[in-house]
């Protein structure tokens, strides 16, 4: 089997997925600050439980404070991650499955748009939606 080709120096895939995983790890312990720390001041956020988009990190922080300490995820899977680079932006898409206590399972689709700013990547747009159940 041939050696794996190392990612190009300008390929943000590993860095962005690492940022996302670190934020998800904290989220699962009830700490939304991991996401706030990687969001740009002008981030926009869509959530299926909200009627409208949230504009700006300050507004997102106010919303996340209502959730602080209330999320408990025992483990999660970040499936099918794909990072597509477009200039100074990169789009991360993935499927997310979270497991709480017992057999509780929640399935999500996620799209995060990252922007390169000051040598680091920050989220400028985030969109979470429920994954439809598989029909048999």
Labelled PLM ranges:
Residues 1-36, 44-136:
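A beta-strand edge to alpha-helix "cap/lid" segment located at domain peripheries
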């Amino acid at each position: 089997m041939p050696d794996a080709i190392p990612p190009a120096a300008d390929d943000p895939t590993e860095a962005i997925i690492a940022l996302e995983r670190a934020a998800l790890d904290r989220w699962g312990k009830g700490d939304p600050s991991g996401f706030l720390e990687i969001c740009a001041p002008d981030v926009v956020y869509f959530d299926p439980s909200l009627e409208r988009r949230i504009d700006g990190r300050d507004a997102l922080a106010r919303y996340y404070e209502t959730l602080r300490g209330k999320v408990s995820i025992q483990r999660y899977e970040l499936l099918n991650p794909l990072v597509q680079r477009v200039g100074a932006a990169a789009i991360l898409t993935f499927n997310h499955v979270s497991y709480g206590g017992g057999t509780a399972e929640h399935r999500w689709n996620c799209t995060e748009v990252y922007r390169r700013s000051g040598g680091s990547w920050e989220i400028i747009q985030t969109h979470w939606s429920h994954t439809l159940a598989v029909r048999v």
